[in-house]
A protein has these predicted regions:
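Rossmann-fold dinucleotide-binding core
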Residues: 8-10, 99-147
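Rossmann-fold NAD(P) dinucleotide-binding segment
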Residues: 56-118
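NAD(P)+-binding Rossmann beta1-loop-alpha1 motif at the extreme N-terminus of oxidoreductases
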Residues: 1-68, 127-130
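Generic preference for hydrophobic
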Residues: 52, 93, 137-139
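Residues in the short beta-alpha loop(s) of Rossmann-like NAD(P)-binding domains
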Residues: 37-39, 72, 142
Length: 147
């Protein structure tokens, strides 16, 4: 995928997600965001060039890579339920949520029938490292998706 064709959607631009979303903008990617709970971060990112979309439908159809950075599995499942009927075939979902033991498997199973790609990628570090762009990550997905 060419950088100009990559339309990244980010859900969860709060405590950890703000710094990650900020770095996506710094690298000149198109960034779509949708309000989850934190308006302050949304407003800052919009001023820096992010596009705030108001509905999950518009968010899903205008993003071919979606990053989900929410607090836990329960919230992640609610987000997926809101998105899944609008996801376009071939969309890549990168889930950096802190899940419970079976959370990522449950999310994967929720998405199986949608012809999208799912990648679990918990990160190591905190908000400061997120803003500096120096988080570590563990990636779990099918090899062809990773490549």
């Amino acid at each position: 995928m060419v950088r100009n064709n990559i339309k990244i959607g980010f859900i969860g631009v709060g405590y950890m997600g703000y710094g990650m979303a900020l770095n996506i903008l710094k690298r000149k990617y198109n960034l779509n965001i949708i309000a989850h709970t934190n308006r302050k971060s949304i407003n800052k990112l919009v001023k820096l060039g992010a596009m705030e979309l108001k509905t999950y439908k518009n968010f899903a159809i205008n993003s071919n890579v979606i990053i989900i950075c929410v607090t836990n599995t329960i919230i992640a499942k609610k987000v997926i339920n809101s998105l899944k009927s609008f996801l376009i075939k071939g969309t890549l979902i990168i889930d950096i949520t802190t899940h419970n033991q079976n959370g990522s498997i449950e999310i994967f199973n929720m998405l199986k029938s949608r012809s999208v790609y799912y990648c679990e990628s918990p990160v190591m570090g905190g908000p400061k490292q997120a803003e500096l762009g120096i988080l570590g990550a563990i990636v779990g997905c099918e090899k062809n998706i990773f490549n």
